[in-house]
């Protein structure tokens, strides 16, 4: 099973190099993050996106912050910086876990005992570990997913939503990583990729990855999924996750919830592919997941799409009248009752219950 050749995150010469996903697929360009503030900007403005990639970028942001110092800040100053990082994208739990992992290694109780050099070294080691761990976990997750499909090479039709491939992770992917691994196992695939309004991650990113991987695919608008399921045999819907509550309720890119409802109606298995880093056992269900509200302009215009010079590709007002108000929740929550199974690096959870989730992650 091969990893993707796409590398959205590179650590080179103590600088973080990020593939600028705002300008894909028209332009392939990279930006260099030299400070924590650069990383916060990259996360908030979606230069980098996808819960695992956000967390890894955040970890390297912490490294860049420490590398910029000539003396240790007070612990209160450090907490403020970490808080600013956390606020850049609040829904995905992965970023919070990365910050907490750093904090657990250098806790307030014995913060004074660590030298600046020790923390600089430890921060970089953690970020590099997270980069390699995510790739390994994605590959393992994909191996487990193969058991859900025929052992013999078959023709499979799959629907996916948003972007969950190499661009969203350390380099293989969760849901799209599963699709890639099914192809590598000899299956003949046809993938229907939701365009994923309003930010068009499916149209701009997933479609691009599928073409790069030479996987047969069709781009569909989000509201075509019902037509696709009713007009041809669909073997599975596979999506990713930004946060999974204790009971299995799953926050993912807006539009996932209605896709799950349509899949349930048509008897199509609906799978979530995610690693343990997307689990949040501190919350009982999806109602506790904070939903990020983004700018209205992402709904009312395509001005957020930039060319290689950073200029808007289209003028404001081409989609909706100027002054029209819009709602723009970036995520919705799919109830566990609509999810056939959650594919993880520890195995497959099905049926999706709190007890089964805790068992597979050895919490009970």
Swiss-Prot record:
**The protein's annotated pathway:** Amino-acid biosynthesis; L-methionine biosynthesis via salvage pathway; L-methionine from S-methyl-5-thio-alpha-D-ribose 1-phosphate: step 1/6
Q: Write out the entry's keywords from A to Z.
A: Amino-acid biosynthesis, Isomerase, Methionine biosynthesis
**Keyword Isomerase among UniProt keywords:** yes
Question: What is this enzyme's EC?
Answer: 5.3.1.23
Q: Which GO terms describe its biological process?
A: L-methionine salvage from methylthioadenosine
The molecular function terms of the Gene Ontology recorded here are: S-methyl-5-thioribose-1-phosphate isomerase activity
- Is the keyword Isomerase in the record? yes
Q: Mind telling me which HAMAP family this protein's record contains?
A: Salvage_MtnA
- Record-given protein name: Methylthioribose-1-phosphate isomerase
Species this chain originates from:
Leptospira interrogans serogroup Icterohaemorrhagiae serovar Lai (strain 56601)
Give the gene that encodes this protein: mtnA
């Amino acid at each position: 099973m091969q990893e993707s050749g796409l590398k959205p995150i590179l650590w080179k010469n103590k600088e973080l190099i990020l593939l600028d996903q705002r300008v894909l697929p028209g332009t392939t360009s990279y930006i260099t993050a030299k400070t924590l503030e650069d990383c916060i900007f990259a996360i908030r403005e979606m230069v980098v996106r996808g819960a695992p990639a956000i967390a890894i970028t955040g970890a390297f942001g912490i490294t860049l912050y420490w590398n910029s110092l000539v003396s240790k800040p007070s612990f209160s100053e450090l907490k403020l910086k970490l808080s600013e990082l956390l606020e850049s994208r609040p829904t995905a739990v992965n970023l919070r876990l990365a910050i907490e992992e750093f904090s657990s290694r250098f806790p307030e109780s014995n913060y004074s005992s660590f030298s600046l050099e020790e923390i600089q070294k430890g921060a970089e080691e953690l970020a590099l570990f997270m980069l390699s761990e995510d790739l390994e976990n994605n590959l393992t997750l994909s191996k487990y997913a193969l058991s859900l499909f025929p052992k013999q090479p078959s023709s499979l039709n799959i629907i996916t939503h948003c972007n969950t491939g190499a661009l969203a992770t350390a380099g293989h992917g969760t849901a799209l990583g599963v699709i890639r691994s099914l192809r590598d196992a000899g299956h003949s695939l046809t993938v229907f990729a939701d365009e994923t309004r309003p930010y068009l991650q499916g149209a701009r990113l997933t479609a691009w990855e599928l073409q790069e991987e030479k996987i047969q695919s069709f781009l569909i608008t989000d509201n075509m999924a019902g037509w696709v399921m009713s007009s041809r045999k669909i073997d599975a819907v596979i999506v990713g996750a930004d946060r999974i509550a204790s009971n299995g309720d799953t926050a993912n890119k807006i539009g996932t919830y209605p896709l799950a409802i349509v899949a349930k109606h048509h008897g199509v298995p609906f799978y979530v592919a995610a690693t343990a880093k997307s689990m949040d056992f501190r919350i009982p269900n999806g109602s506790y997941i904070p939903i990020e509200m983004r700018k209205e302009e992402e709904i009312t215009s395509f001005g957020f799409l930039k060319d290689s010079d950073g200029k808007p590709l289209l003028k404001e007002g081409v989609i909706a009248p100027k002054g029209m108000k819009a709602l723009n929740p970036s995520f919705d929550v799919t109830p566990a009752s609509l999810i056939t199974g959650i594919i993880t690096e520890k195995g497959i959870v099905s049926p999706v219950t709190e007890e089964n989730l805790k068992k597979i992650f050895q919490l009970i």
